[in-house]
């Protein structure tokens, strides 16, 4: 039998001791049961280091671009998606909201972007590619991504990213601000990938 242990919503400096404790527990259980055991670390992901200096640049460019405009056909498609997924039929929401505050406890989810953010300053942008309330990781999102609603969102995000990169290329002061915040948030932490070197143990998953 296998024992699976997931650790989420923990900063990396706290996660290693917990992982080591879990390994010790597995070893103790194996000794008590007089059986062999094997530990396979299948995945391990760092939390994402935010960069508000970079986020402010991206936010400014989103506001320059303005909200995405949708056709009547796209809005009707969005409402149909909401109907079949039992969501309020509110259509699309293209409002550009203010840059959100950095939350101490941002909630669940994980991404290897977190690992990247410990090696280089990272700027994220979120743009609508599906109707309000659409369940993520579902066929409904895929359906929207395969038609103009998703295409418009992807192009809008691409424009905001390109404009942000252009700002950084042309303004050394902006680069300095982003880099300084990255170094301050990272502190003295040294990035070490949690997953061991070599091919991933996919057969153990």
Can you describe what each PLM-predicted range is?
Residues 12-15, 19, 47, 51, ...:
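Generic structural signal for well-ordered, non-membrane alpha-helical segments
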Residues 1-12:
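Single conserved hydrophobic/aromatic residue that forms the stacking wall/gate
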Residues 58, 116, 161:
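Divalent metal-coordination and catalytic microenvironments
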Residues 9, 40-42, 126-128:
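Generic beta-strand/beta-sheet core signal
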Residues 6, 37-43, 73-74, 178-182:
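Beta-strand segments within the central parallel beta-sheet cores of soluble alpha/beta enzyme folds
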Residues 75-158, 176-205:
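Zn-dependent metallopeptidase/amidohydrolase metal-coordination segment
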Residues 13-40, 47-91:
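Acidic-enriched catalytic cores of C-N bond-cleaving enzymes acting on peptides and small amides
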Residues 162-170:
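Short glycine/serine- and small hydrophobic-enriched flexible loop segments
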């Amino acid at each position: 039998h296998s024992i699976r242990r997931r650790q989420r919503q923990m900063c990396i400096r706290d996660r290693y001791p917990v992982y080591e404790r879990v390994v010790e527990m597995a070893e103790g259980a194996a000794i008590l049961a007089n059986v062999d055991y094997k530990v396979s670390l299948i995945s391990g992901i760092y939390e994402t280091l935010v960069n508000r200096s970079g986020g402010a640049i991206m936010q400014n460019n989103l506001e320059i671009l303005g909200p995405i405009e949708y056709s009547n056909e796209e809005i009707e498609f969005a409402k149909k998606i909401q109907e079949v997924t039992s969501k309020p039929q509110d259509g699309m929401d293209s409002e550009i909201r203010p840059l959100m505050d950095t939350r101490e406890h941002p909630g669940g989810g994980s991404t290897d972007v977190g690992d990247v953010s410990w090696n280089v300053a990272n700027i994220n942008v979120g743009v609508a590619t599906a109707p309000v309330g659409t369940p993520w990781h579902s066929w409904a999102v895929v359906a929207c991504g395969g038609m103009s609603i998703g295409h418009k969102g992807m192009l809008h995000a691409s424009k905001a990213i390109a404009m942000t990169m252009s700002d950084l290329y042309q303004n050394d002061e902006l680069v300095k601000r982003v880099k300084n915040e990255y170094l301050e948030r990272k502190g003295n932490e040294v990035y070490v990938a949690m997953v061991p070197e070599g091919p991933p143990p996919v057969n153990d998953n």
